[in-house]
UniProtKB/Swiss-Prot annotation:
Coiled coil found in the keyword field: no
Coiled-coil features, chain-numbered ranges: none
Family that this chain belongs to: Belongs to the MMM1 family.
Source species taxonomy: Eukaryota, Fungi, Dikarya, Ascomycota, Pezizomycotina
Source organism (scientific name): Neurospora crassa (strain ATCC 24698 / 74-OR23-1A / CBS 708.71 / DSM 1257 / FGSC 987)
Listed name of the protein: Maintenance of mitochondrial morphology protein 1
Residue stretches of biased makeup (Basic and acidic residues): 373-389
Comment text on domains: The SMP-LTD domain is a barrel-like domain that can bind various types of glycerophospholipids in its interior and mediate their transfer between two adjacent bilayers.
Amino acid sequence: MADICPSRSEPTLSFTQGLILGQLSVVLLLAAFIKFFIFGDPPSPEVVASIRATDRRSRTLAHKKSILSLRETNALQLVQNPALNKKHVLRPGPPILTIGSILSKTYYKVDSHQPESLDWFNVLIAQTIAQFRSDAQHDDAILSSLSKALNGTARPDFLDEIKVTELSLGEDFPIFSNCRIIPVDEDGLSFGTGKAFDANMATREGARLQARMDVDLSDMITLAVETKLLLNYPKRLSAVLPVALAVSVVRFSGTLSISFIPSNPSNNEPAKMIFTFLDDYRLDFSIRSLLGSRSRLQDVPKIAQLVESRLHRWFDERCVEPRFQEIALPNMWPRKKNTRGGDETISDVERSMSKAKGVDIAKDVREEARKEIEAEAHGGADRVPDSLRYRHRPRADEEFPGAGSMPGSMPGSMP
């Protein structure tokens, strides 16, 4: 019987030893996670910038290849079915002002023209930004707009109200340089990269001129906020974790591309200006964080990486090629309602003065007018009035006393 039912082997570890071993494993995993994931040293900014630039460039090249392949497919369909090519029937010829004619009449040679420095443009932009910063110092509109944007409907439930604690618009100004004009097609692709420009290539519908300029900004533009992480499980407000975050833009350099799209009266579309940044830009942040109320964790590297990655993705999805921002331009033709200056300016000043001062200004003006009239009345008897209405034509005897006749009278005339 002992040979049929073998005896069970005794476990080498007791229950207590297994429990302790399991707890140690969990502690080691948590320690490794905290050390390498949360407090691990982030990669250098140069490495991160290189990786992001490579990803953006690969995305741009993939978009360009898809556009070129789509063009080849459409061209093949037009060759196989000429009836689809209605462009030549509806539009017998290119517009009068083509890209080639504009470049020739403005004496701009794409291949040989030297890039411009844009010093005058930098001065105008600096004045505009300085005025914007000055207005922000005396107005809370920008703070109100930021608070509404941060506490909008997209705020998750586990976040408390977000408060803006610091806002710095910087002290320096962006520098634009190396501006050049490049003809592009309707998809924003250059004509014949590496070849001499031919005006006949730019006669396609949608072709336009594109201004590209380098932008460089080294400043400290800071936005600091604070909020609380709310743990609503298993019951509401089970735990609260204060969080403070400050994000600063310290460096931006890239290539800005600006294009002008004419209006289309047939579709009732206004003229537009589009701008985008090429994929070779660099955007550096300085991110500071603070977690907790008593035992605080300061400048957690992983939080900085997550926030920076989210900001880069937000910027890429909005104004980095192939995406762009579009601005509708108003009608540039002079209109009466847009006229300023002259009599309207005087009337506007008078209305503003009446609103600001009201009865006090009118009273002072009447008092000054009364004093002037009284002074003229007292001194009127002692001086001869010079007004034209007090003058009279002099008689002959007053102008030439002692003469009986007008000088120069003919002999034999009546005295």
